Amino acid sequence: MIRLSDIEWKIRYERESSNLDFKREQYKKEKYESLIKDIMSMANNPVDGSKHIIVGVKETPDGNKEIFPIEPTDFVDVATYQQIVRENIEPTIDFNYYPYDIPEGKIGVFEITGISNHPYMMKKDYGNKLKKGECYIR
């Protein structure tokens, strides 16, 4: 896992890029299509090193960040997200999702690591938009 200071640095000074994304809120069941697509896109990115999706942060068009803390009781367990991804993407993508406290409140961090088995693609159809065999890249 990366240190809090690294997360705060990303929030304060980095913009969204091929290996960093900000999401205002957690992925709820009705947004699992986006979760699958976002994790796959990051994993298929050829840039070396860890990739991160930081949840509870919105980047504005001018690059500023707005914080939307996650209530501790609303925090989604990593096992829920891992199950959705494992059931729908092949080969398996290693990632973690964990809470981090910053001065403004609790945020969530997806950390995607150990990516070496490209390409990652849909194992089966999911919802109306994701079809078996599709592959996304960020």
What are these model-predicted stretches?
Residues 1-138:
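Conserved N-terminal catalytic/coupling substructures associated with nucleotide/phosphate chemistry
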